[in-house]
C-alpha cells in the first residue's frame, strides 16, 4: 500500500505530504482502526479473495467533528486497484452512512496534484466548496444544498 494524506485515492491519518510504503502496521496504530467508536467515526473496507482468505484492498473512513457535525474523510486504496472506482463506491457508502447518523457533510484536505481523489468527490454529485492554499485544497462537502432563489441570472 502507498499511504499519503489523500494522495491517489488514499490516506490514513499520517503527516501531510508524507508518502511511504508499508507492509505492516504497529499494534497501537492498528487498534485505532479495529476499535471503532461508530458514534464518532465510520470505516468501510473493500475486500478481494476467496471466502476465509479475503484481503483488504481499500479503506475509507470519516471522523466526526462534534462542533460542526461534519466528518473528516480519509481514503487508502492499494496501488494495484487504483482507477477501478473502488474509492468512489466507498465514498458513496460513507455518504449514506453519515446521513443516517445525522452528519451535515464532510471535510477533506486534498493536494491539488491529486486529481484522482478530486474525481472521486466530483462523482459524488454533492456540492463541493474548495479553498486552495499552498497547493492544498480544503474541501467542505455539505449534504444539503442551499435553496437558490429564482432570479433573472439563473433562470
Residue ranges of predicted features:
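Long, contiguous binding/interaction regions
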Residues: 1-155
Amino acid at each position: 500500500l502507498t499511504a499519503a494524506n489523500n494522495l491517489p485515492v488514499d490516506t490514513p491519518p499520517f503527516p501531510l505530504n508524507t508518502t511511504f510504503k508499508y507492509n505492516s502496521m504497529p499494534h497501537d496504530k492498528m487498534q485505532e482502526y479495529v476499535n471503532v467508536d461508530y458514534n464518532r467515526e465510520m470505516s468501510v473496507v473493500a475486500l478481494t479473495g476467496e471466502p476465509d482468505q479475503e484481503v483488504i484492498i481499500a479503506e475509507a473512513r470519516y471522523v466526526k467533528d462534534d462542533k460542526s457535525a461534519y466528518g473528516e474523510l480519509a481514503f487508502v486504496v492499494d496501488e494495484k486497484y487504483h482507477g477501478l472506482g473502488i474509492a468512489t463506491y466507498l465514498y458513496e457508502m460513507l455518504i449514506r452512512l453519515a446521513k443516517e447518523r445525522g452528519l451535515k457533510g464532510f471535510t477533506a484536505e486534498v493536494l491539488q496534484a491529486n486529481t484522482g481523489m478530486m474525481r472521486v468527490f466530483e462523482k459524488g454529485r454533492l456540492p463541493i466548496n474548495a479553498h486552495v492554499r499552498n497547493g492544498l485544497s480544503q474541501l467542505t462537502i455539505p449534504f444539503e444544498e442551499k435553496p437558490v432563489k429564482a432570479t433573472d441570472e439563473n433562470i
